[in-house]
A protein has these predicted regions:
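Hydrophobic, well-ordered beta-alpha structural blocks that scaffold small-molecule cofactor pockets
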Residues: 1-40, 45, 50
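ADP-ribose/adenylate-binding Rossmann-like module
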Residues: 79-99
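Flexible, charged surface loops at secondary-structure boundaries
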Residues: 1-4, 54-58, 79-80
């Protein structure tokens, strides 16, 4: 079983009250490689929050913290990462992308 699964957290925030912040911290605690992507530069602990569409290889999981309207600009990016799975967190469910 592979323990270090690269995860892209899309909709990352440096606000400790946001679920995306907690997700990054939890993933790092369990030694996963995390790529945090948000709309503002910043950090979650030692993890930088990147903006735009950072190129990544070997992505296991994309976990979404963006509502469906905001996801639209990332459709091609998400698919280009070729993740093994996409996690739609509560409030992010999107029939168009899940197909």
């Amino acid at each position: 079983m592979e323990l270090n699964k690269k995860t892209v957290v899309l909709g990352a925030s440096n606000n400790p009250e946001r679920y995306s912040f907690l997700a990054v911290e939890k993933l790092k605690k369990y030694h996963h490689t995390v790529v945090a992507v948000g709309n503002k530069l910043g950090n979650i602990g030692e993890t930088p929050i990147l903006t735009g569409f950072p190129a990544e290889q070997g992505v296991d999981t994309v976990t979404l913290y963006l509502n469906p309207v905001l996801q639209a600009q990332y459709y091609q990016y998400i698919l280009s990462l070729k993740p093994k799975r996409i996690i739609f967190n509560p409030g992010t469910e999107n029939a168009a992308l899940s197909e």
